[in-house]
Amino acid sequence: MFGAELVGRETGGQSTDQPYSYRDSARTWDTVTQSVLKAPGWEDSYAVITIEADKHGNGAHQETVAPSDLRQYAKLANASQILYAPLIFVTKLSIFLLYLRVFASARRGMTYLSIHLLIWFNLAFYLANFFLKIFQCIPRAKIWDSNTSGHCININIPILVTAAINVVSDLLMLCLPIICVWRLQMSIRRKLGISAIFAAGIFGCFASIMRLEVSVRDRNTKDPTYDWYTEITCGILASCLPALPTFFRHFFGKARTMLSRSRTRGSSNRSQDRSLEKATELYTLTYPRGQKHHIITDNRLIDQDRELDDDRTQIFSGPSYAVTEARVEGRTPLGQRAYHGDDTVLNGEDGSGHCRGILKVVEVDVESGPGHPTVKCRCDNW
């Protein structure tokens, strides 16, 4: 592990409990993303520097880093410090421009002036910070090689000033949109929801405050490989949070569409299955004489060549058969007169062959099955 590799080599025999080696960090050429390949920008250079610095002790305590790595790290750290000012300014500028578009589209009023004042103040401050980091040592080689003759400024003073101004700037950025939201004409519930989105920027404020506290407490210590990276990460996350509602609406909208399509397909399949299943239906009819007449329809698949001996039942021939039976309770079955498909009349009479006269006519539609014609059955009670 890291301790076993480093002890006795260049750390002066110091041991460490760190469970990994900073030299095993991801290399620059291992980190290739589609977005970087599509649209690389100058800000991507900061990521390249950071990834390269990881294998020279970035994020590890300085006492655990080899001297040769510290020299290389100092070069990369100075490059990242130079980029720090424009990077943090661009992060804040993106938030300020969002505020202008949302809250000051009319280009007048106190909100518009306040946002522009913050933009120009941050521009001036971070521009000065940019040149300060470039010329912090003369010659510049003294930044990473203390044996080089020359002089350097006390870098702790700019760090403290930068941390303090970042805290004030971040708090103003946090309060400004919330004040604007509560001046809008909308429901309390919606105001709370929008305020919660912008209030997520409090993570950046916490990072600035913690950086200021650590800078004041450890101003006499030197551990440049471990500090001041949290603030930039939190700032970038905070600047992306206002876009989360749009992302979630897009994501959940597609999820609802896919779920709806799945349910529609499932419903269609179940409907088709139910069309293949026909339950027995019982119709009860009351006649003027007080007699109950039951017409029972039931799906039965019967071979065409099969003959039924029961003369009480008429069979409709075809690919599948629907049996219709009519009888009066307590009496012998009544005759039936049925119209089947091509309106062919099937005569049904009582046992004597005499038709008693029609008391009630009932028409029943029986579907033989999917793809087969509907059978119309007309039952006459004599």
From Swiss-Prot:
- Classify the main location: membrane
Name the glycosylated positions.
Answer: 78, 147, 269
- One Pfam family name is Fung_rhodopsin
The protein's location, in the record's own words, is: Membrane
Q: Which keywords does UniProt give here?
A: Glycoprotein, Membrane, Transmembrane, Transmembrane helix
A Gene Ontology cellular-component term: membrane
- According to the record, the segments passing through the membrane are 80-100, 112-132, 159-179, 192-212, 228-248
Give the residue ranges for region: Disordered.
1-22
Note whether Membrane occurs among the keywords.
yes
**What's the protein's topology in the membrane?**
Multi-pass membrane protein
The source's superkingdom equals: Eukaryota
Respond yes or no to whether keyword Magnesium is given for this record: no
Homology family: Belongs to the SAT4 family.
Q: What is this protein called?
A: SAT4 family membrane protein
